[in-house]
Amino acid sequence: MGCMKSKQTFPFPTTLESEKRHVSEENFMPEEKFLPRIPSLVNVKEEVKEPPGPQIVVFEFAQHLSQEILSDALQQWAGNNLKYYDIPYIESEGP
């Protein structure tokens, strides 16, 4: 009888199908896509814009919050390190 999974069709395209698809796609693709693009010689000036007020407040809050989280994490790690520093690390050889 066999397994039902083995009788189902493979959901992904085979290599032959993908090769046929690429051949047909090349006919419809313009030649411009294959040519390297040359940057234009127009002078582009980048302007540095100051972020508006609310964005500065949000940035400062996020910076403060990330520093607080990092500080708490380091304190927690230090506490656990002191608590368990005298227990030797034992490597296991099996699961």
Curated annotation (Swiss-Prot):
Localization, UniProt: Cell membrane
Keyword Cell membrane: yes
Region PKA-RI-binding: start-end pairs: 56-74
Entry keyword set: Cell membrane, Lipoprotein, Membrane, Myristate, Palmitate, Phosphoprotein
Lipidation (S-palmitoyl cysteine): 3
Signal peptide: none
Residues that bear Phosphoserine: 40, 92
Gene Ontology cellular component list: plasma membrane
Residues anchoring lipid (N-myristoyl glycine): 2
Primary subcellular site in the record, as a coarse category: membrane
GO molecular function terms listed in the Swiss-Prot or TrEMBL record: protein kinase A regulatory subunit binding
Post-translational modification (record): May be palmitoylated at Cys-3.
Record keyword Transcription regulation present: no
Domain of life: Eukaryota
One family name in Pfam for this protein: SmAKAP
Stated family: Belongs to the small membrane AKAP family.
Complex formation: Interacts with PKA type I regulatory subunits PRKAR1A and PRKAR1B. Also binds to type II regulatory subunits, but at a tenfold lower affinity.
Task performed by this protein: Binds to type I regulatory subunits of protein kinase A (PKA-RI) and may anchor/target them to the plasma membrane.
Protein name (Swiss-Prot/TrEMBL): Small membrane A-kinase anchor protein
Natural source organism: Bos taurus (Bovine)
Taxonomic classification: Eukaryota, Metazoa, Chordata, Craniata, Vertebrata
